[in-house]
């Protein structure tokens, strides 16, 4: 892949210069969608089970890159999260994410998963850790979840960067969804699209390729 803006690649590397590990995160959340074919008028009469401002995290996929080993993936984990506003997943959500009702029914709360994530990340934090996601949605969703649950935000205290922004800056291209960006780079997509751990893993592979480019 040809790097169109090497100055932006250098800026990305400089941003990460003082950290050893980069955490690649992808969330899945409760959601619903209008049935296909509805007119705008019909959509007004159709009640969604989950509105956009009611979405809650149900999966946290996390992949750790070691920047001292060429941005190699050195660890990964996923956690399901039990939603509280809309505890029953919609058929649309289950079809999109392949997450089953039993997965979230048996999961911890947002705050319990936050604590588990903190414990998992402790060894990496000791040597320097930042986190990234594809876009700003994940950071905003975690903040909304924390406010709703009256608890500390997941990944609180860690600096965040938007990998999607760095991708389009480095390539001087239009902003893309994650899977098209991965495949445009020449990487074969691995796993299920819209599953947190699979998306995080593919994000980690792409970010590693970007950092090693040029």
Where are the predicted features?
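Metal-dependent phosphoesterase core characteristic of DEDDh/y 3'-5' exonuclease domains
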Residues: 2-6, 15, 20, 55-99, ...
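Short His-Asn-centered micro-motif
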Residues: 25, 107, 133-135
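N-terminal accessory regions of nucleic-acid-interacting proteins
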Residues: 1-42
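Ser/Thr-centric signal marking residues that sit
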Residues: 27-30, 48, 97
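Metal-dependent phosphoesterase signature
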Residues: 95-116
């Amino acid at each position: 892949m040809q790097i169109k803006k090497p100055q932006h690649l250098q800026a990305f590397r400089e941003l990460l210069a003082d950290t050893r590990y980069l955490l690649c995160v992808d969330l899945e959340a409760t959601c619903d969608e209008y049935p296909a074919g509805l007119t705008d008028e019909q959509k007004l009469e159709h009640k969604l089970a989950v509105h956009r401002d009611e979405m809650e995290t149900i999966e946290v996929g996390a992949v750790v890159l070691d920047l001292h080993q060429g941005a190699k993936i050195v660890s990964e984990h996923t956690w399901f999260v039990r939603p509280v506003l809309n505890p029953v997943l919609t058929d649309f959500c289950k079809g999109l994410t392949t997450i089953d009702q039993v997965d979230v029914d048996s999961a911890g709360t947002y705050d319990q998963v936050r604590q588990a994530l903190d414990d998992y990340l402790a060894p990496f934090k000791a040597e320097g850790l930042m986190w990234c996601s594809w876009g700003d949605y994940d950071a905003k969703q975690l903040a909304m979840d924390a406010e709703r649950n009256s608890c500390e935000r997941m990944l609180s205290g860690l600096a965040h960067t938007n990998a999607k922004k760095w991708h389009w800056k480095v390539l001087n291209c239009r902003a893309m969804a994650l899977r098209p960006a991965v495949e445009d780079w020449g990487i074969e997509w691995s796993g299920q699209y819209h599953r947190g751990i699979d998306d995080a893993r593919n994000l980690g592979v792409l970010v590693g390729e970007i950092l090693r480019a040029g």
